[in-house]
Amino acid sequence: MSAINTLPPIKSIFNDFKEITKAGLAISVVFSSLAGYLLGIHEFNLETIYVLLMLAIGGYCMVGASNAYNQIIEKDLDTLMNRTKNRPIPSGRMSVNTAFTIATILTITGLTILYMINPKTAMFGAISIFLYTCVYTPLKTVTSLSVFVGAFPGAIPFMLGWVAATNDFGIEAGTLFLIQFFWQFPHFWAIGWFLFEDYKKGGFYMLPTGKRDKGTAMQIVLYTLWLTAASILPSFGYTGRLYLTPVSAIIVVLLGLWMLVYAIKLYKNKTDKSAKTLMLVSVAYISLIQVVYILDKFLR
């Protein structure tokens, strides 16, 4: 048999690359960065479109690298959980050395591209990788406070786009960071709820009380309220160039109430089904909020 015939098919390699970088998650994170960038630019021209493309590629590299490092660190724990045991490393389809090489190349490529945009963007990208890989990931098996720590790198992308557009970290970027920071809690606690048994096999502490109880559900409700409050801050005129018109502010409030309804349903029902529904609603919420912000800017 020839050496060529013993190589894995291209499609299989591509699928493993998508899985080691968590392509779906990476694309959603890149969308947040692009949304922040569109909010930060003054006008569309060839230069802004070029930077937009650089941000998309550099952002994917950074998120993909973080996810690859995460799977390297958790390779033994991933074999214990149903949802992760078929990932490239625990299944044996990819070696740790290959995964590390991919992660390293993505890190170098991503940081280089982001630095070409401006040094601040590269700095925040590097901070994100460090916090996610070296702090959040190890803490997941130690304390439920890992979600709090993970919320910091998780909140960077929306803000990163603004920094890429303006080369500045001010009240606007801080507001975008705050929105995505509060969003992390109901989103990841909902995931921690309906995947509780699987996480338990891996020894992960994801829920604030350690249980699927009213205490956890109440905190989800409270953070959903904080999220809604943070999301309408730009409507009060104290967030610099980041501003929401009254109509958009009403839409944002309605979206917040929509998510709050499902958070309250989880509090009342305390079921995995309610938690999974809330998780899906939270994903829709953050994307819709970003779309509303963008449309408000360009259509006002």
Swiss-Prot record:
Main localization, broad class: membrane
Gene Ontology BP term (one): heme A biosynthetic process
Keywords from the UniProt entry: Cell inner membrane, Cell membrane, Heme biosynthesis, Membrane, Transferase, Transmembrane, Transmembrane helix
GO molecular function, one term: protoheme IX farnesyltransferase activity
TM region positions: 24-44, 46-66, 99-119, 122-142, 145-165, 176-196, 220-240, 244-264, 275-295
CDD domains: PT_UbiA_Cox10 (cd13957)
Family the UniProt entry places it in: Belongs to the UbiA prenyltransferase family. Protoheme IX farnesyltransferase subfamily.
Name of the featured protein: Protoheme IX farnesyltransferase
Organism of provenance: Flavobacterium psychrophilum (strain ATCC 49511 / DSM 21280 / CIP 103535 / JIP02/86)
Biological classification of the source: Bacteria, Pseudomonadati, Bacteroidota, Flavobacteriia, Flavobacteriales
Encoding gene, per UniProt annotation: ctaB
